Amino acid sequence: ASWAEAVFPAGGVQVGVGELLNPKEEAVLVATIAEWEAKTSGEIVIHIAKKLSSKDGMKDAYFWFEKLGITKTKNRNGVLLFIAARDHFVAILGDVGIHSKVEPDFWNQKIHLLIEAFKSNDKLIGLCRTVESIGAVLAQHFPLESNESNPNELDNALSKSHEGH
């Protein structure tokens, strides 16, 4: 899996899982995931943990990457966006299928854009733009043929937990 990690600045208000997005914002984000997944065989999953379970945020991200079944997609082209809200930690993990198609800096760019949005308190805009960007690269490398079925291999609803795992 490919990954990028960053800790977004702690200068803002500490937030819990339910406080990161309100229900309407969450619905917009889930619809954005579905919209982009309709264009590709790739899968985009977002997991929001209230806090990390240890000091190693990547360990938590990898735990959810496996637990949510992202490594079990047909084309190994799933992507996890992992957020630990109270610890201000963000990671993106791409499975081997998509990792082999993009430059490692791609993930770092997405993390940077998301962190800038979080710093500006534009969480929904940042998350939607990140999903759109990931969706676009998935559609570029894993496009659907006109007659190809596209089962939703992984749930589009946001995954949430109290701790990283």
What does each model-found stretch correspond to?
Residues 1-77, 85-165:
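A structural boundary signal for the start of the first folded domain, especially the loop/turn
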Residues 81:
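Short basic (Lys/Arg) and small-residue
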